[in-house]
Amino acid sequence: MYINYLKDLISFKSVTPKSDGAIEYINDLLKQHGFKTEIKIFGDSKSEQVTNLYAVFGSNEPNICFVGHVDVVLEGNHELWHNASPFKVSQQDGKIYGRGAVDMKGAIACFLAASLDFIKNNTDFKGSISFLLTSDEEGKAKHGTKEMLQYIYDQGYKINFAIVGEPTCEKEIGDAIKIGRRGSVNFKLNIEGLSGHVAYPHKANNPLPCLIIILNELTNIKLDEGTEFFQRSNLEVTNIEVSNNTSNVIPASTEASFNIRFNNLHSAETLAKQVEEIIKQHCKEYKVDYKLEYSSSAESFIQNPSDKIKEFAKVVEHTLKIKPEFSTSGGTSDARFVKNYCPLVEFGLLSETAHKINEYTKISDLQKLYDVYYNFLMEIL
């Protein structure tokens, strides 16, 4: 059934933060199979409204919750997709093409099938199975999983263990389980000089040499050596702007943006202080003014492998005959919100085609993921 569920889910044009009916489809399906469901819409305005779902079968502990998102990134040029439509499934050579196939409608489809089959085959299991789904993970992630978790806990629900269905595997299903994530902090630096004619540099103060020196130092600084579970923190320049289209004018100002992906040796605040010390030193030397702004969407985190995390890893190994590696690579995810409530793993399909034109998953990979999810429910419940 996971193939049918996936095809149905891909057909919804759920570009973040819209559900486009995807969450309602899942809600109806789960309700038909005895789940207690609730849809909540959060958001400050109509354009920011986010659809969220919590559905639970059973009332006993442990509550095993699948956490995911139905929203997808923009599809790009339709003409480059199979069938010229990213929301019309194309099935070829054992693969299913469509936006969201791996990120992450495929994982949702597999856990839907696994949980419904498990409930059908095990009428007296000891715990609960639940879903927490949102339509806002790829975007601002402001009114999605974070807000929904707070809501369900206020209602008296408790999650004992979560599976976040992000596409975590690298080369084959089962090679990686994420137990943490790097943090992310964005910087915007504005340097104010004094404009003038290029023939009279002594009557101006060009902000660009200062910016070049600063960016050179920042991009060459070694923030750390990495840790057991984390790679080195890295800084990447993402944009440089100079509002000057005239070749004989020294610009008055310049602006640069950069991002740091950091491990658990840092926080956004400590990195901001380190960055500003470098900026302050060079701006003083060049006698220019600066303004530095920064914002962080996620701090880094790492979990000590709990008993349930270890059990999940054993299920992966026994099911797929591959020993998974505990990993923290990749970008940010909603796991950063879930970890405040319960232990978790992130485990899903291959990440290779996520967000790309002709995103696809192999049907054989869907079967493997289904098997892991089903076997874990059998083991834990």
From Swiss-Prot:
Record-annotated active site: D71, E137
Protein keywords: Amino-acid biosynthesis, Cobalt, Diaminopimelate biosynthesis, Hydrolase, Lysine biosynthesis, Metal-binding, Zinc
Name under which the protein is recorded: Succinyl-diaminopimelate desuccinylase
Subunit record text: Homodimer.
Binding site for Zn(2+) 2: D103, E138, H355
NCBIfam families in the cross-refs: dapE_proteo, PRK13009.1
A single BP term in Gene Ontology: lysine biosynthetic process via diaminopimelate
Function: Catalyzes the hydrolysis of N-succinyl-L,L-diaminopimelic acid (SDAP), forming succinate and LL-2,6-diaminopimelate (DAP), an intermediate involved in the bacterial biosynthesis of lysine and meso-diaminopimelic acid, an essential component of bacterial cell walls.
Gene3D superfamilies found in the cross-reference section: 3.30.70.360, Zn peptidases
Known pathway: Amino-acid biosynthesis; L-lysine biosynthesis via DAP pathway; LL-2,6-diaminopimelate from (S)-tetrahydrodipicolinate (succinylase route): step 3/3
UniProt-recorded Gene Ontology molecular function terms: acetylornithine deacetylase activity; cobalt ion binding; succinyl-diaminopimelate desuccinylase activity; zinc ion binding
Source species, domain of life: Bacteria
Family: Belongs to the peptidase M20A family. DapE subfamily.
Organism: Rickettsia rickettsii (strain Sheila Smith)
Catalytic activity: N-succinyl-(2S,6S)-2,6-diaminopimelate + H2O = (2S,6S)-2,6-diaminopimelate + succinate
Co-factor requirement: Zn(2+); Co(2+)
UniProt binding sites for Zn(2+) 1: H69, D103, E166
Entry note: cofactor: Binds 2 Zn(2+) or Co(2+) ions per subunit.
EC number from the UniProt entry: 3.5.1.18
InterPro entries assigned to the protein according to its UniProt record, in alphabetical order: ArgE/DapE_CS, Bact_exopeptidase_dim_dom, DapE_proteobac, Peptidase_M20, Peptidase_M20_dimer, Peptidase_M20A
